[in-house]
């Protein structure tokens, strides 16, 4: 079945027909053909995508991506721990909110939504507060589309002996990285982002020695990261509670298609071409990005809304959807914006078609 429209969002996103077709079969969660032949293969493939080094493992966790973030924060940080969070968007703020809900002490570094965090501020906090045990940062902050400089921040955190948690929700699979080289202890992502699967579970790729320290630390039964991992390790891919079987099988297919495309490097190149084509086309129509070009990720881009008195996002959105494209409203607190994603089963030709559709949808310019 063909899609009625293209999702130009940061996830859920447009998937291939073959990924959707992979969900047409039912699976028994007790069978080896599911646990060993699908779940365990996924776990192995994820680690290989994340690093060339040994010592890392992976665990899949039911629910939205935020559930995996909460599982990590709630399991990795002990009763005496303290978290430093870099917050320059809604998703950094969400990590801090999770810590607050879980009664985990938290130091927040907030440079603002349109600025990259300042390394010296983080280093000062780490040097002055020995109670901090963990540092968390979002790689691609999809509030704006900003790509945060994780190398410098992870390096600073490791220099101070801290455990590093990376929210790579909207970057893993679409931006090359080696988490061992970066010094990342826990990396979190989701099925419905750059791997191009469908919603239903997230996953954590972790240094095994750090994950083993999480035993008996979880603040939630269903979000116990260690227990979920241990169950999968001992039972060859078995989940503790109901597994999202159809989503998992679709993700397995999506991983195969990532390999067929040429791996993360090739997908990154496609996403970059999409994003550059998008920005050039939007500028030709008079739209300006919220961020300077050097801050952009290849994942999603925020554009200032037109200042014309007749412009309304909902009307603009509806006209685009009628032409087969779905975009995202803005999420920046101090600027009127909208967002356009370019990940998923989206190619440069699709972006060129989008630019034509946007030109037709600019009703406020009609005389």
UniProtKB/Swiss-Prot annotation:
Keywords: Aminotransferase, Pyridoxal phosphate, Pyruvate, Transferase
UniProt EC number: 2.6.1.37
Residues with the N6-(pyridoxal phosphate)lysine modification: 193
Pfam families: Aminotran_5
Coiled coil regions, renumbered to chain: none
Complexes and interactors: Homodimer.
Family assignment from sequence similarity: Belongs to the class-V pyridoxal-phosphate-dependent aminotransferase family. PhnW subfamily.
Described function: Involved in phosphonate degradation.
NCBIfam families, alphabetized: PhnW-AepZ (TIGR03301), PRK13479.1 (NF010006), transamin_PhnW (TIGR02326)
Full protein name: 2-aminoethylphosphonate--pyruvate transaminase
The organism of origin for this protein: Vibrio parahaemolyticus serotype O3:K6 (strain RIMD 2210633)
